[in-house]
Swiss-Prot record:
Task of the protein: Core subunit of the mitochondrial membrane respiratory chain NADH dehydrogenase (Complex I) which catalyzes electron transfer from NADH through the respiratory chain, using ubiquinone as an electron acceptor. Essential for the catalytic activity and assembly of complex I.
Membrane-spanning parts: 3-23, 25-45, 60-80, 96-116, 122-142, 153-173, 178-198, 200-220, 237-257, 274-294, 323-343
Species in which this protein is naturally found: Halichoerus grypus (Gray seal)
Stated name of the protein: NADH-ubiquinone oxidoreductase chain 2
Gene name of this polypeptide: MT-ND2
GO MF annotation list: NADH dehydrogenase (ubiquinone) activity
Location of this chain's protein in the cell: Mitochondrion inner membrane
Stated family: Belongs to the complex I subunit 2 family.
Enzymatic class: translocase
Catalytic activity: a ubiquinone + NADH + 5 H(+)(in) = a ubiquinol + NAD(+) + 4 H(+)(out)
Ion transport is among the record's keywords: no
Quaternary structure and partners: Core subunit of respiratory chain NADH dehydrogenase (Complex I) which is composed of 45 different subunits. Interacts with TMEM242.
Source taxon at top rank: Eukaryota
GO cellular component: mitochondrial inner membrane
Length: 347
């Protein structure tokens, strides 16, 4: 893709999200979602392979269905309230339709089937955009309408997402699919706290985006898409091996890394609201994610796979690509836990 075309498409994707973030009118929000969806498809298809075309088609059909449900919910809300404002949704049917549409756009269970397939069919850079930037707009609308959402519906979807995100990633060898299932699980954690403390959801989203960006950048730097290619990292870039190990543990939510902080705060907030069984169940389910990340870390950093190259290290290293954003992102992704007491102001 030529740079001028890429710049135009990327600015349209960003403009669509910004329209959603800054609007309080339902029609403008819907237009923002449509702009974003139509602009992201050429980015997903930039590889020009049958797999990328299939992934883009799946993404388009899912997002178009979600947009249709969203518009239906908006029209029902307009019939009952007589206004286009996002401030409140008095009708439960309209609220349910809007919630389902937004969770479908996020890829939460039971509408999660497209996420692993689409992520696997596209390049690492496109997958990075899909699993980070594309989550911002739907979550911002859920944040704004959180008082009108049915808590039981959202909690049910959150539990299903955490379960499927954990179980789905157990049998995977493709890194993009593992990150896709991890995304589904993280969306579940964000959804469960949304009706109790929406600001905590924003914190969780920020940490999730930082960790996912760092992980994708490391995989892109190393050109790794499978666990087998990742197992040769020690031979090419020894420092990357340690960084990937720590980032995997952080994404799995292992203390004392940054990924543990949002889970800790969410469990604390739920227990303050006299909910004991739900946070206990979610904490146990999070161990599934931690397990497949530990397995990935073991493959990457703690074992040496059979190789035709008998040397322990390359005599000539590849020229390291300079990624300016990577060092601060890795620091935030791994060392944020000591700052957790400062984040208590969010409550």
């Amino acid at each position: 893709m030529k740079p001028p075309i890429l710049i135009i498409i990327m600015s349209t994707v960003m403009s669509g999200t910004m329209i959603v973030l800054t609007s309080s009118h339902w029609l403008l929000i819907w237009i923002g979602f449509e702009m974003n969806m139509l602009a992201i498809i050429p980015i997903l298809m930039k590889n020009h392979t049958p797999r990328a075309t299939e992934a883009s088609t799946k993404y388009f059909l899912t997002q178009a269905t979600a947009s249709m449900l969203l518009m239906m919910g908006i029209i029902i809300n307009l019939m009952f309230s007589g206004e286009w404002s996002i401030s409140k949704i008095p009708n439960p049917i309209a609220s349910g339709l809007v919630t389902i549409a937004l969770t479908m756009k996020l890829g939460m269970a039971p509408f999660h089937f497209w996420v692993p397939e689409v992520t696997q069919g596209i390049s690492l850079s496109s997958g990075m955009i899909l699993l980070t930037w594309q989550k911002i707009a739907p979550l911002s609308i859920l944040y704004q309408i959180s008082p009108s959402i049915n808590p039981k519906l959202l909690i049910t979807m959150a539990i299903a997402s955490v379960l499927i995100g954990g179980w789905g990633g157990l049998n995977q060898t493709q890194l993009r699919k593992i990150l896709a299932y991890s995304s589904i699980a993280h969306m579940g954690w964000m959804a469960v706290i949304l009706t109790y403390n929406p600001t905590l959801m924003i914190l969780n989203l920020t940490i999730y985006i930082t960790m996912t960006l760092s992980t994708f950048m490391l995989f892109m730097h190393n050109s790794s898409t499978t666990t087998l290619s990742l197992s040769n990292t020690w031979n090419k870039l020894p420092l990357m091996t340690s960084l990937i190990l720590v980032l995997m543990m952080s994404l799995g939510g292992l203390p004392p890394l940054s990924g543990f902080a949002p889970k800790w705060m969410i469990i604390q907030e739920l227990t303050k609201n006299d909910m004991i069984i739900l946070p206990t169940f979610m904490a146990i389910t999070a161990l599934l994610n931690l397990y497949f990340y530990m397995r990935l870390s073991y493959t990457t950093a703690l074992t040496m796979f059979p190789s035709v190259n008998n040397m322990k290290m390359k005599w000539q290293f590849e020229s390291a690509k300079k990624i300016i954003l990577l060092p601060p992102l890795i620091i935030i992704s791994t060392m944020l836990l000591p700052m957790t007491p400062m984040m208590s102001i969010l409550e």
